[in-house]
UniProtKB/Swiss-Prot annotation:
GO biological process, one term: translational initiation
Protein family according to the UniProt entry: Belongs to the eIF-3 subunit L family.
Name of the protein in its database record: Eukaryotic translation initiation factor 3 subunit L
Organism: Gallus gallus
Biological classification of the source: Eukaryota, Metazoa, Chordata, Craniata, Vertebrata
GO (cellular component) term, any one: eukaryotic 48S preinitiation complex
Length: 564
C-alpha cells in the first residue's frame, strides 16, 4: 500500500541530518558537548523530509478514521464490523511495511523525529502521539547507537503509563483497535524495557553522581509492582481467563467476555499479558507461578488466540525453560520439539520480515541448545528431523555432556537461558560491580547443582544396557565406586528418571509420575536385575494413520468436485 506523497526518487538526495557549520564548535567539556548535541538534535528534528511528513499525516488519518468508526460502532452497540477490520488491515500494512521501509531509509541508526516535532502535523492528537512515541522509543532501544539515555528510559515508561491508562481507565471500552502484531509487540517491548532498565540501574560503575541520585530519587519508575499491576489489570479487564476456560470446554467465549472482553483490543491484550506474566515470572526465577498463569491455555491445541508467531514461539520457549528448571524433562522435551517442528515448517513465512526472522531465529537456536541439555539429562525419542538438526548443531557437545563435562552444560545454559533479573532496587551506596549478574549466577548454580547430582547417571545407564544380571559389587568396581556409593547412585538414577509428566487436562502443571528411561532394574540382595524397556517403533500404526488421512482427503476433494 502506498500513502499520499510517497516519492522516494525525488527525495533520495535529501539528507535531514546534514551538519551545519556551527556544529564544529565543541567545548571539550563532555557534559556541555552532550547538552549541545541534544539541543542540536532537537533543532534538526524540526526539518522533516516531505515524504516523512506525508507518511505521518497518512498514518494519523488512518488511525483517526478507525477511532471515529469505532466510536460510531460503540454508540450503535456493535463490537466490530468489516469497516473496522479493513482499517485495522491498513494500519497493519503501515506498521509492518511502510514504517520499516522508511526506518531503513531515513533513520537506520538514528531516532525518528520527536513527538513534539510532528505534533503540528497531526493536530496535537494525544492518542496518536502516544502510539507514535511507543514506536519512537522502541526504535531507540533497538537501533540507535548507544541505546536510550536515562531520560529516554523514564520518558518511555511514562508513555506506556499514558497508553495503559487510556486503555484501562476509560469510562467504557476505548475506541481503538490495533493489529494483533502491534498489540503483542507493545506487551513484549514493555517487558523488555523493564528488563533492560533493571539491568541498567545495577551497573553503576560508569554512572555519574547525578545519574545515581536521579535513580535513587525515582524508585517507582519501572518498578516490578507497577509492571505486574499493568499485566494483571489487562488480564482482569479483558476477563480473558474466563473466556479461555469456556473456549477450551467448547463453549462460546463471547458469552462470558463482558463489556470490555468482547472487543479485540482488550481480548488480545489480555491474552498477550498472560504470556507476558509467564515471561516475567521466569525472569524472576519463579517457574511454578510462570506456568500457573497459563493454566487456562491449552498448549497442545491450536487456538484462535495464537495468531502471532512470535507470541507462540515466546510462549513455548519460556514454558519449556520453566519445565527444564522444574526437572520436568519429558515435558520440556515435548514442548521444545513441538515448537521447533513448527518453526521448521513455517520458516519461509518469517523470512519476509527481517526483524521477525532475527528474533525467531535466535530463540530457535536457544531452544535447540536447551533441548540438547534436556535430552542428555533425560534421553528419549523425538521427531527424526529435529533429532537430525540437533546432531548437526550439538552432536559433539552432547557427547561431552554425556561424559559429564560440566563446562559444556554451563556454556549452553548461559547461551540459551533468559536474562534473569532482580526485582529489588539496588543499594546505590554500595553496589557490587557484578551485582547485575547475581540473578543469573544464582540460577546457574541451581542448574549446575542438578547437573552435578546426575553426573554419573549417563555412565551407569550405558553399563546397565549391557547386562541382564550382575553382582552389585562387580558393577560398582567397573565404575570405581564403593558398593555403598554405587547403591546411592542407583537410587539417584531411579529418582531422577521418574518425572512428573503432563498427560491430559488444560493446566500445564498437571501430570502424573512416569519414567521414559530405556532401562529399568531392581536389586535382590546383592544382585542387580536389569530389563530393557525400550519399545520397538511400530511403523504399521504410522502407515495406517497416514492411509486414513489420505482417504479422508480424497473424499473431501471428491465432494468439492461435485459442487455446482
Amino acid at each position: 500500500m502506498a500513502y499520499p506523497g510517497e516519492d522516494y526518487d525525488n527525495d533520495a538526495a535529501y539528507d535531514p541530518y546534514a551538519y551545519s557549520n556551527d556544529y564544529d564548535m565543541h567545548t571539550g567539556d563532555p557534559k556541555q558537548d552532550l547538552a549541545y548535541e541534544r539541543q542540536y538534535e532537537q533543532q534538526t528534528y524540526q526539518v522533516i523530509p516531505e515524504v516523512i511528513k506525508n507518511f505521518i499525516q497518512y498514518f494519523h488519518k488512518t488511525v483517526s478514521d478507525l477511532i471515529d468508526q469505532k466510536v460510531y460502532e460503540l454508540q450503535a452497540s456493535r463490537v466490530s464490523s468489516d469497516v473496522i477490520d479493513q482499517k485495522v488491515y491498513e494500519i497493519q500494512d503501515i506498521y509492518e511495511n511502510s514504517w520499516t521501509k522508511l526506518t531503513e531509509r531515513f533513520f537506520k541508526n538514528t531516532p525518528w523525529p520527536e513527538a513534539e516535532a510532528i505534533a503540528p502535523q497531526v493536530g496535537n492528537d494525544a492518542v496518536f502521539l502516544i502510539l507514535y512515541k511507543e514506536l519512537y522509543y522502541r526504535h531507540i532501544y533497538a537501533k540507535v547507537s548507544g541505546g536510550p539515555t536515562l531520560e529516554q528510559r523514564f520518558e518511555s515508561y511514562y508513555n506506556y503509563c499514558n497508553l495503559f491508562n487510556y486503555i484501562l481507565n476509560a469510562d467504557g471500552p476505548a475506541p481503538l483497535e490495533l493489529p494483533n502484531q502491534w498489540l503483542w509487540d507493545i506487551i513484549d517491548e514493555f517487558i523488555y524495557q523493564f528488563q533492560s532498565f533493571s539491568q541498567y540501574r545495577c551497573k553503576t560503575a560508569k554512572k555519574s553522581e547525578e545519574e545515581i541520585d536521579f535513580l535513587r530519587s525515582n524508585p517507582k519508575i519501572w518498578n516490578v509492582h507497577s509492571v505486574l499491576n499493568v499485566l494483571h489489570s489487562l488480564v482482569d479487564k479483558s476477563n480473558i481467563n474466563r473466556q479461555l476456560e469456556v473456549y477450551t470446554s467448547g463453549g462460546d467465549p463471547e458469552s462470558v467476555a463482558g463489556e470490555y472482553g468482547r472487543h479485540s483490543l482488550y481480548k488480545m491484550l489480555g491474552y498477550f499479558s498472560l504470556v507476558g506474566l509467564l515471561r516475567l515470572h521466569s525472569l524472576l526465577g519463579d517457574y511454578y507461578q510462570a506456568i500457573k498463569v497459563l493454566e487456562n491455555i491449552e498448549l497442545n491445541k491450536k487456538s484462535m488466540y495464537s495468531r502471532v508467531p512470535e507470541c507462540q514461539v515466546t510462549t513455548y520457549y519460556y514454558v519449556g525453560f520453566a519445565y527444564l528448571m522444574m526437572r520436568r524433562y519429558q515435558d520440556a522435551i515435548r514442548v521444545f520439539a513441538n515448537i521447533l517442528l513448527y518453526i521448521q515448517r513455517t520458516k519461509s513465512m518469517f523470512q519476509r520480515t527481517t526483524y521477525k526472522y532475527e528474533m525467531i531465529n535466535k530463540q530457535n537456536e536457544q531452544m535447540h541448545a536447551l533441548l540438547a541439555i534436556a535430552l542428555t539429562m533425560y534421553p528419549m525419542r523425538i521427531d527424526e528431523s529435529i533429532h537430525l538438526q540437533l546432531r548437526e548443531k550439538y552432536g559433539d557437545k552432547m557427547l561431552r555432556m554425556q561424559k559429564g563435562d560440566a563446562q559444556v552444560y554451563e556454556e549452553l545454559f548461559s547461551y540459551a537461558c533468559p536474562k534473569f533479573l532482580s526485582p529489588v532496587v539496588p543499594n546505590y551506596d554500595n553496589v557490587h560491580p557484578n551485582y547485575h549478574k547475581e540473578p543469573f549466577l544464582q540460577q546457574l548454580k541451581v542448574f549446575a547443582d542438578e547437573v552435578q547430582q546426575q553426573a554419573q547417571l549417563s555412565t551407569i545407564r550405558s553399563f546397565l544396557k549391557l547386562y541382564t544380571t550382575m553382582p552389585v559389587a562387580k558393577l560398582a568396581g567397573f565404575l570405581d565406586l564403593t558398593e555403598q556409593e554405587f547403591r546411592i547412585q542407583l537410587l539417584v538414577f531411579k529418582h531422577k528418571m521418574k518425572n512428573l509428566v503432563w498427560t491430559s487436562g488444560i493446566s500445564a502443571l498437571d501430570g502424573e509420575f512416569q519414567s521414559a528411561s530405556e532401562v529399568d532394574f531392581y536389586i535382590d540382595k546383592d544382585m542387580i536385575h536389569i530389563a530393557d524397556t525400550k519399545v520397538a517403533r511400530r511403523y504399521g500404526d504410522f502407515f495406517i494413520r497416514q492411509i486414513h488421512k489420505f482417504e479422508e482427503l480424497n473424499r473431501t476433494l471428491k465432494k468439492m468436485g461435485q459442487r455446482p
